[in-house]
From Swiss-Prot:
Full protein name: Uncharacterized protein PA1579
Superkingdom per UniProt: Bacteria
Disulfide bonds: none
Cellular component, GO, one term: cytoplasm
InterPro entries xrefs: START-like_dom_sf (IPR023393), START_dom_prot (IPR028347), START_lipid-bd_dom (IPR002913), START_lipid_transfer (IPR051213)
Molecular function terms, GO-annotated: lipid binding
Pfam (any one): START
Provenance organism: Pseudomonas aeruginosa (strain ATCC 15692 / DSM 22644 / CIP 104116 / JCM 14847 / LMG 12228 / 1C / PRS 101 / PAO1)
Function recorded in the entry: May play a role in the interaction of the bacterium with animal cells.
Residues covered by the START domain: 1-202
CDD domains: START_1
Length: 202
């Protein structure tokens, strides 16, 4: 079920920037345990975009397999409460995730349309875009209205893969500034650490 892999990215992606804007002027915000996190302001949004980059000592196929494990992937995606595949058609998939928020902030959920492509050098790129009206909203959750991003798995040789995880989003509703500011760092940092740990144990 290789297509299920396309859903792996979404649960950690709840804060960032406007879905139709482009982030630029990336600045290093954190460099910890082999993971670099960059942030960028986005015109028209009060939320920052984030980009995380790390090297994983595993090949692309190993990382793909981890992402295809829908239930298992929720264990290493930051703030993931639930994740499931809604539909798959070839290179396109629609996924649903719930994201944990600290009390008293209302939890978020998000439907993501993921399109996967592979390049000639073996790089896998997963393009992410929110599709908030794909299914009815759930009671007790705030649906994320805008999100764009991507996963990029690029082979570097000798069994090493460079993984980039980038997201821009509008989380909907009201988010305290302290939470928004911490989430844009914690989401890529913890997600990439978790993925790396799982991949390198295989």
């Amino acid at each position: 079920m290789r297509g299920i892999l396309r859903m792996t990215v979404l649960a950690a992606a709840v804060f960032g920037v406007a879905g139709n804007a482009l982030a630029e002027d990336w600045k290093l915000a954190k460099d910890e345990d082999g993971v670099k996190v960059y942030l960028s302001s986005v015109q028209g949004s009060k939320y920052k975009a984030y980009r995380g980059v790390t090297d994983i000592k595993a090949d692309v196929a190993t990382i793909e397999a981890l992402q295809e494990d829908v239930k298992g992937s929720c264990k290493w995606i930051h703030a993931c409460a639930e994740m499931k595949l809604l539909k798959q058609e070839g290179a396109d998939a629609w996924t649903y995730s719930k994201i944990d928020m600290p009390w008293p902030v209302t939890g978020r959920d998000v439907v993501i349309h993921v399109t996967t492509e592979k390049t000639a050098d073996g790089t896998v790129i997963r393009h992410l875009k929110a599709d908030p009206t794909y299914i009815p909203e759930e009671k007790g959750q705030i649906r994320v209205p805008k999100l764009v991003g991507e996963w990029k798995l690029q082979p570097k040789g000798q069994g090493v893969t460079e993984v980039t995880y980038q997201v821009e989003t509008e989380p909907g509703g009201s988010i305290p500034s302290w939470l928004a500011n911490s989430f844009v760092v914690d989401a890529p940092l913890n997600t990439l650490k978790g993925l790396r740990s799982a991949a390198e144990k295989r």
